[in-house]
A protein has these predicted regions:
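Beta1/beta-strand and adjacent pyrophosphate-binding region of the FAD-binding site
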Residues: 4-20
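Conserved N-terminal glycine-rich FAD pyrophosphate-binding loop of Rossmann-like flavoproteins
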Residues: 41-71
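A conserved short coil-to-beta-strand element within the FAD-binding core of flavoproteins
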Residues: 132-145
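Short hydrophobic core segments
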Residues: 13-15, 38, 136, 155-175, ...
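Short beta-strand to alpha-helix junction loop
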Residues: 73-81, 101-120, 170-175, 203-205, ...
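Glycine-rich FAD pyrophosphate-binding loop
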Residues: 13-15, 29-53
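A conserved FAD-binding loop/helix module that cradles the flavin
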Residues: 169-182, 186, 388-415
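Residue-level recognition of phosphate/Mg2+-coordinating polar/acidic sites
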Residues: 30-31, 58, 78, 84-87, ...
Length: 415
C-alpha cells in the first residue's frame, strides 16, 4: 500500500486513514485534487475492519442520538446526513441494506467490502499519494499553509490539512490521543477523553457462575439510586462484570457518575428472556425498570409454572441452565425479584484500551459544522472521532465519521 510521494505536489494532506480520512480521500480524488494521505498503521482502515464484529454497521437511518457537542453533530448531519452518505457509498459501488432499528450493513456483511470500495475510490487517482506506517508527531502553520512532522524526521507541506487522526479508544487498532494534544498547541480546547462504548466492571458475587452467558435484557443505570438511562439488547456476563451492547451503551453515564463521586448501579431486567408480553410490546422508561416494572408479571408466570410443572421443572425450558441453577432453591418471590430487578454496583469500565468509542475530544465551538474548518487555523479541517462528539451504538459513530470526512473533503478540495 505504501507509495512514496513527490514532495510539495499535494494540495491537501490527510492525517489518518480511518473512516473519515478515507471518505475525504475519495471526495478529493473525485474532484481531482492532489493529496497525500499519511497513516501511522501499516494498513489503512484497521479499526474500520473491526466495526460491527467485522460486519461494519455502516450508518443508522433513525433519529440522531449523539452526546458531547450534540448540536454540532445535528448541524453536520443536516449538511450531510444518512441520505447523502448513502449516495456517497452507492457512487463507490457498495450495495447495502437496512436491518432492524435503522442499522445499515453492506450486503456482504463484511467490513472488508466497505474498505475495498473506499480504497478503490482513490488509490488509482493520478493525484493520490499514500504513505502507511508513518507516525505524525507535529503540525505547524507556516506561511500560507502547514508543515507536518513525522517520527522518521520527514516533513511534508501543503496549503491545507485534513486531520482525521481519531481518538484514543482501542489503541491496539491504532487509537491515539497524540494529535488531539497537538491541536491544543494551536489553541483548540480539548475535553478529556473517556470510554463511551465499553464493558462495565461490577461486583461479581451475585452473578458468579454466569460467566460467558448471553441473554436478552433491559439494563438501567442509576446514580445514587435514581435512574439515569436504560438500554435493551443482548447482555453478556463476564468474570469482571457485564458486557454486550446494552451494557456498553451505559458506559458513558457510568463514567460521568463515578467521576462525580456518585454511587453507580445497574438494574437488570430479564423480562425479554421470560417472554413477558409488556417487555416485547414496549420499552419501559428507566424509572419503571429500576422499580422492577415486570416483577408482578414474572411472579405470576413463575407461580403458574410451579403449579403446573412443579419445583424441579420450574425453570426447565425457560432459563439457561446456569441461571436456573442459581435460582432453583430461591422462593419464587425472590426469584421473580432477581429476574426483573437484580442490582449490581458498578465499579468502573474496561477503559479506553477496550472501548469501541471514546467520549470527549476537541471542542467543536471553534469548528465550522458545514466545512469542518478550524476557526483558529484556517485551512485546517478537523473531522471524525477526534471531535467532542460520540454517538449511540448502531452505526451513529460511523455515520458522523463519514459525514465529517465528506464535508471536510469537499471544503478542502475547494480551498
Amino acid at each position: 500500500m505504501t507509495q512514496r510521494p513527490a514532495r510539495n505536489k499535494a494540495q491537501v494532506i490527510i492525517i489518518g486513514g480511518g473512516a473519515s480520512g478515507l471518505a475525504a480521500a475519495c471526495v478529493l480524488a473525485r474532484a481531482q485534487v492532489p493529496f497525500l494521505l499519511l497513516e501511522k498503521e501499516h494498513k489503512l482502515g484497521r479499526k474500520l475492519l473491526a466495526t460491527g464484529n467485522g460486519r461494519c454497521n455502516l450508518m443508522n437511518l433513525g433519529p440522531p442520538v449523539y452526546f458531547g457537542d450534540n448540536r454540532f453533530a445535528s448541524r453536520v448531519l443536516a449538511a450531510c446526513g444518512a441520505a447523502e452518505v448513502g449516495e456517497f457509498f452507492t457512487g463507490l459501488g457498495l450495495a447495502f441494506f437496512e436491518e432492524e432499528l435503522g442499522r445499515v450493513y453492506p450486503n456482504t456483511r463484511q467490513a472488508a467490502t466497505v474498505l475495498d470500495c473506499l480504497t478503490a475510490g482513490f488509490i488509482n487517482s493520478p493525484g493520490a499519494q499514500v504513505i502507511t506506517g508513518v507516525q505524525v508527531t507535529g503540525l505547524r502553520q507556516m506561511g500560507a499553509g502547514f508543515e507536518v512532522m513525522t517520527a522518521s524526521g520527514e516533513r511534508h507541506q501543503a496549503p491545507r490539512i485534513i486531520l482525521a487522526a481519531g481518538g484514543p479508544a482501542a489503541p491496539k487498532l491504532g487509537g491515539s490521543a497524540l494529535m488531539a494534544q497537538e491541536l491544543t498547541r494551536l489553541g483548540h480546547p480539548l475535553q478529556p477523553f473517556f470510554p463511551a462504548l465499553c464493558a462495565l466492571t461490577t461486583e461479581t458475587r451475585p452473578i458468579r457462575g454466569l460467566n460467558g452467558l448471553r441473554v436478552p435484557a433491559y439494563v438501567t443505570l442509576l446514580h445514587d439510586g435514581l435512574p439515569v438511562s436504560t438500554a435493551a439488547g443482548e447482555l453478556l456476563f463476564a468474570n469482571y462484570g457485564v458486557s454486550g451492547l446494552c451494557a456498553m451503551q451505559l458506559a458513558r453515564d457510568a463514567e460521568t457518575g463515578l467521576a462525580a463521586g456518585k454511587k453507580v448501579e445497574i438494574s437488570l431486567d430479564f423480562a425479554p428472556l421470560l417472554g413477558l408480553a409488556p417487555a416485547l410490546m414496549r420499552r419501559l422508561e428507566p424509572a419503571e425498570l429500576a422499580g422492577g416494572g415486570h416483577q408482578a408479571a414474572a411472579l405470576d408466570l413463575l407461580t403458574d409454572r410451579l403449579n403446573t410443572l412443579g419445583r424441579e421443572r420450574l425453570y426447565t425450558g425457560l432459563l439457561p441452565w446456569a441461571m436456573a441453577e442459581k435460582l432453583q432453591n430461591l422462593p419464587i418471590r425472590e426469584a421473580a425479584q432477581w429476574l426483573t430487578g437484580l442490582r449490581l454496583d458498578v465499579t468502573g469500565t474496561q477503559g479506553l484500551d477496550n472501548a469501541q468509542v471514546a467520549a470527549g475530544g476537541i471542542d467543536c465551538r471553534d469548528i465550522s459544522p458545514l466545512t469542518l474548518e478550524s476557526k483558529r487555523a484556517p485551512g485546517l479541517y478537523i473531522c471524525g472521532e477526534i471531535l467532542n462528539v460520540d454517538g449511540d451504538t448502531g452505526g451513529y459513530n460511523l455515520l458522523f465519521a463519514w459525514a465529517t470526512g465528506i464535508l471536510a473533503g469537499r471544503a478542502a478540495g475547494r480551498g
